[in-house]
Amino acid sequence: MDIKEQIHGLTEEMLTNLGRLVAIDSQLGTPAEGKPFGEGPAKALEEGLKIAQELGFKTVNLDNYCGYAEMGEGDEIVGIAGHLDIVPVGGDWSYDPFKLTREGDYVYGRGTTDDKGPVLEALYAMKLLRDSGVKLNKRVRLIMGCTEETGSKCMEHYNEVAEELSCGFTPDASFPCIHGEKGLLQMMAYSKNTKIISADGGFVFNAVCDSSTIVVPAEEGLKERLEAVLAETKLQEYKVTEENGQISIYAKGVPAHASTPTLGVNAIGVTFECLEKAGFKDDFVEFYNTHIGTSCDGKGIGLKFVDEYGELTLCNGMIKTENDVISCTIDIRVPVTLKSDEVRRMCEGRLEDENGRIEILGIGDALFFPRESPLVNALYKAYTDVTGDTENKPMVIGGGTYAKSLKNIIAFGPEKPGIDYRIHSADEFILVSGMAEAVLVYMEAIKNLLAI
């Protein structure tokens, strides 16, 4: 039986095991004794390691921060790092996000592509390599993390208690290969003076706000003017209601990952833009539209920048009101050639005026491997040898992965170019055919890395 037939024969088993992982709500929870990230991530890690044990692998649980499955012998380690935690569900799902649902080649559920499915693809690639009798001159270790979506503290713990990887990849991005990841700048915007009664929207820092509700004092004719300008927007849905001297504006935009905000429609930004167009005069509305807005390029705070690997992007993910102060999250992906001190210099003097202020929470450096580095070449060759695709080339992305937390690895698959898998959105899915191909690619990748 050739390898493709073997993978085909394992498809139902892979999907059953994926269903076991998808059924676990592994969002970041409340820490408890022995469970630093709460019940869900710990349960997902336990199940992931159990599946690896059932497939015959040695497993280690590193204090419920993360764990790993391993095969082979030797001092050097080829590492694969995936994650079992998920982002909040959010949005309007057509399927139960915690029940694997198959329709033809499509399999729906939260975490199917980000990143529970890819963890299993790598695990089955390891199984098939082991069963084929290939010589393992190094150890091959699949690390299962629990907080990639919320800061990767799991990998901080790994670095403290476990061995450094010689080389490897994280199956948490796109094919053909990711040789760079933009830097991350996180900010908060705050109101100083505002007539807005309440503002609520978004559910995570790193996704475009897909729904919001803004409540403002009623003004004569404002409801009608708002309805007129909202009708001209790209919102999927909106509703303006007036009662008890207040106007409530509900807006439903389009979700997107913070690394690609132009693919979404920011419900908050559109609402604030429409408030201004409708003649609602407010200090924070003016501040927001001037400094944040809907353009996604950072020009409002002096950060518009493009290099040969991509442009700077800005995403407003959440808004809330607390103690009469409105706050907004700002997630900025910084091109790989732009250093953190340059970022601070560019936006200096642009972050505050009489209407509001923006505070820098932190700046994370970019990751970059030269295109011709041995690691990039080894992984890209695995992809092209299996798929025959030489048109798509190694790229730089705005997303951040475990490659920034672990030494000597880069992101590699499994998303195929041109397909929106709806990660961080409703109806996230993975393709069964894509899973089979990814297993093949990861088998080749591991063999190539064993030879470095």
Language-model regions: role of each:
Residues 85, 230-238, 278-279, 349-355, ...:
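A common structural junction motif
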Residues 48, 119-129, 158, 271-275, ...:
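Buried hydrophobic packing segments
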Residues 2-110, 134-136, 251:
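Acidic/His- and Gly-rich active-site-bordering loop/insert found
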Residues 255-323, 329, 333-345, 357-452:
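An extended, acidic, His-containing surface patch that forms the Zn2+-binding/catalytic region
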Residues 87-102, 184-185, 189-191, 241-253, ...:
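Acidic-glycine-rich active-site phosphate/pyrophosphate-binding loop
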Residues 149, 155-335:
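Midchain, well-structured core segments that form catalytic/ion-binding scaffolds
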Residues 103-105, 125-141, 225, 278-285, ...:
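Phosphate-handling active-site elements
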Residues 54, 77-144, 150, 161-165, ...:
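Active-site metal-coordination/substrate-binding segment of hydrolases
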